Amino acid sequence: MAFTFKQFHIDDLNCGMAVSTDAVVLGAWAPLTNAKQILDIGAGSGILGLMAAQRSQANITCIELDDTAAIACQHNIAQSPWASRIRLVQGSIQQLSQAEEYQGYFDHIICNPPYFEHGPQAQLSQRAMARHTDQLSFNELLAAIEQCLSPNGLASLILPIQSLHNFNHLLSQSRLEWVERVDIKSVEGKRANRVLCLLTAQTHRTVEPKVSELTLRDTSGQYSQAMVHLTQDFYLKL
């Protein structure tokens, strides 16, 4: 289906995953202020790359493995106001991260990674690839971020809360460290079901990671003031 934001349009019909609230929240939240080179891992429709282009003056590289999704991503980029600053690489992040030209190249890396680590895969193969870690495990993702992130760079991710324990274990074995964590509650009064993660390649940090919460909707189903403030530059009706 098609999705129109305030400054760009997304056609995600041929992508494994449709435009999601997760992607919008991540794309609006990631701190991109000083970034000059941004990498969007597993770009899909290109939504994160396009949001990053709207929010920064950076050059953006989107990498997408799936052929059909890459075509949709390229189309969405070409139709946007920032086509000159966004380029698409079709292939795997595992391969790109080994290329010498990308070692320590990116100031910011953004990713809404696959999140089903086990269990039955989705019937539709594209959707399965987008949703399951078989194509990109957390271990591979962290290794790629380590390779591609500049020494003072940041990486922004969104994960299901139930994946956090395993993710933290793998993170402890990497050279990356926490900067900030935001637990996301879909509705006021419910338990958090997602977590925004901000990581850095800086080692031996002396500052404790910042921890906070974000509630998306109040008990009546309306967007919370925090959600409105976060996404008002993107959603048409805010």
From Swiss-Prot:
EC assignment: the record states 2.1.1.223
Protein's GO biological process: methylation; tRNA processing
User: Gene3D superfamilies, alphabetically?
Assistant: Vaccinia Virus protein VP39
Compartments annotated for it: namely: Cytoplasm
Catalytic activity, per the record?
adenosine(37) in tRNA1(Val) + S-adenosyl-L-methionine = N(6)-methyladenosine(37) in tRNA1(Val) + S-adenosyl-L-homocysteine + H(+)
Give UniProt keywords alphabetically. Answer: Cytoplasm, Methyltransferase, S-adenosyl-L-methionine, Transferase, tRNA processing
Alphabetical GO CC annotations of the entry are:
cytoplasm
GO molecular function ontology, one term from the record = nucleic acid binding
What family, per the record?
A: Belongs to the methyltransferase superfamily. tRNA (adenine-N(6)-)-methyltransferase family.
Biological role stated in the UniProt entry: Specifically methylates the adenine in position 37 of tRNA(1)(Val) (anticodon cmo5UAC).
What is the recorded name of this protein? Answer: tRNA1(Val) (adenine(37)-N6)-methyltransferase
